[in-house]
């Protein structure tokens, strides 16, 4: 009888420990969420300026993400309304995330995303944090990619500001190239030190 009681307590203790370990692991990355919608065939961010720890002043507007000093984050972008009424359009899908404008005080031109003109040292910081797939365009490797959700990782080793550009495509029923839309707020990294 004592053995059964001890075994039961040990099992309950192990389950509690495993639950705590899973909960700690799940929250260790401090997930950030940005919500987007298609409004009149344009990609619009509906998250508030303060949803992801950005201050009201100098935040870069809706969709701004601040990762505090010493934190790491997974950034998830969700597309809520994906209706496409453009020529032969079917629906919008999230396609990619690009970074650019290293420490730029203003939003870079959409065609100027990437790190082709960024110093190697500064590019290395961004690449270590975000895992860049293509330096020239700033394309980021995703940790999750679905039709209405895309996720990227941010290790936040260094302090800097970088802008991100979300790409949504509207596939066409006629087989022609898809329609492409972008939205581009910023990420403010607090760094590890």
Question: What kind of feature is each model-predicted range?
Answer:
Residues 30-69:
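N-terminal edge beta-strand
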């Amino acid at each position: 009888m004592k053995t059964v009681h001890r075994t039961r307590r040990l099992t309950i203790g192990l389950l509690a420990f495993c639950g705590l370990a899973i909960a700690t692991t799940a929250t260790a990355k401090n997930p950030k969420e940005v919500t987007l919608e298609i409004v009149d065939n344009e990609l619009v961010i509906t998250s508030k300026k303060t949803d992801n720890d950005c201050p009201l002043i100098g935040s870069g507007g809706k969709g701004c993400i601040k990762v505090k000093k010493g934190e790491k984050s997974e950034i998830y972008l969700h597309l809520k309304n994906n209706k496409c009424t453009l020529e032969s359009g079917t629906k919008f899908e999230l396609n990619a995330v690009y970074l650019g404008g290293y420490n730029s005080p203003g939003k870079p031109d959409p065609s100027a995303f990437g790190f082709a003109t960024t110093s190697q040292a500064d590019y290395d910081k961004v690449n270590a944090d975000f895992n860049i797939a293509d330096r020239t365009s700033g394309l980021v490797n995703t940790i999750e990619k679905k039709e209405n959700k895309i996720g990227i990782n941010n290790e936040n080793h260094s302090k800097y500001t970088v802008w991100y550009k979300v790409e949504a495509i509207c596939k066409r029923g006629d087989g022609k190239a898809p329609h492409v839309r972008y939205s581009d707020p910023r990420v403010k990294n607090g760094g590890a030190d």
